[in-house]
Amino acid sequence: MEIVLVVDDEPDIRTVVRSMLTAKGYTVLETGDPQQAIRMATQQAVHLLITDVVMPLMKGTELARRVQEVSPWTKVLLMSAFKVAEITASGLPFIPKPFTPEALVDRVRQILAPPTPFARPSPPNPTPNA
């Protein structure tokens, strides 16, 4: 199963997210320290980083950038209770707090789903010469 790294300065949020995702079979790592999150991402494969945007030690968008520098295959989901302009500017997937377990799990599944191949339209059938 996929490994998800949850980073939030609020321990209660990390606990809730961990509980929601482990119930669905995900392996969840967590930390409140963005620097530790970067170290964790370099030490083992992390499929998805879920990070709060507004944290005192480092913004979530900066953490996402730095994790993807050391682990380019790691996908990112930003979360925040605030409307932050840099969320939109980042172009990264986002889920607003508070969220339901179903909303979080659905968002995680969407992000981790393998890409679907581009469906090319069938060429038109040639018309027989009349």
Give the location of each predicted region.
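Receiver (REC) domain active-site loop signature in two-component systems and cognate sites
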Residues: 55
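Two-component/phosphorelay signaling modules centered on CheY-like receiver
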Residues: 11-29
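Conserved phosphotransfer cores of two-component systems
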Residues: 42-44, 66-74, 83-87
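CheY-like receiver
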Residues: 115-130
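Active-site residues of response regulator receiver
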Residues: 52
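C-terminal output helix
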Residues: 99-112, 116
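Acidic catalytic/metal-coordinating carboxylates
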Residues: 32-36, 59-63
